[in-house]
């Protein structure tokens, strides 16, 4: 089952540009985190508030993933360590328990997922897309076949 995870972590003062540069240097990090349906990471600057002084920049990490958040976070943290290192109190990616503790303390509970098939795993979706490609190709190759030829082509696949 797909689960959302949203994290909003304050960046250390003056590190927003470095965090943006670290994000820009990433090479599809979520492709290396198994079970990730979709994910986004970016630096946010909240609107200024009157009489509140300076406004901190934040790192937003939003993802829909398969399985327990703890195991997903452990792998994602290793891929994103160069970015997360700009966050206040980041413990580093080496200790999974500390990563989970840190992330859970900054988690924003959203209660919904934007994935179209929330009960399907990434693997299920991949298999369904492969089947769709196969059936589309088969339909194109057999267009105009009579019943017997179509049946024979199906059995020969």
Model-derived segments and their meaning:
Residues 1-58, 63-71, 96-157:
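Short S/T/G/P-rich N-terminal loop/turn motif that feeds into the first structured element of a domain
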Residues 74-78:
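"Short basic amphipathic alpha-helical interaction patches in structured regions
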């Amino acid at each position: 089952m797909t689960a959302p995870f949203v994290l909003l972590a304050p960046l250390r003062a003056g590190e927003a540009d470095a965090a943006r540069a670290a994000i820009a240097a990433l090479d599809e990090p979520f492709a290396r985190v198994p079970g990730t349906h979709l994910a986004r990471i970016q630096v946010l600057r909240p609107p200024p508030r009157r009489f509140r002084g300076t406004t901190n920049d934040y790192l937003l990490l939003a993802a829909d993933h398969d399985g327990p958040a703890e195991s997903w976070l452990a792998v994602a943290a290793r891929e994103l360590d160069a970015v997360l290192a700009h966050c206040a109190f980041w413990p580093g990616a080496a200790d999974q328990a500390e990563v989970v503790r840190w992330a859970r303390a900054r988690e924003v509970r959203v209660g919904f997922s934007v994935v179209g098939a929330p009960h399907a795993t990434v693997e299920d979706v991949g298999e369904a897309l492969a089947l769709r490609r196969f059936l589309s190709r088969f339909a194109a190759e057999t267009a105009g076949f009579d019943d017997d030829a179509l049946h024979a082509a199906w059995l020969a696949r």
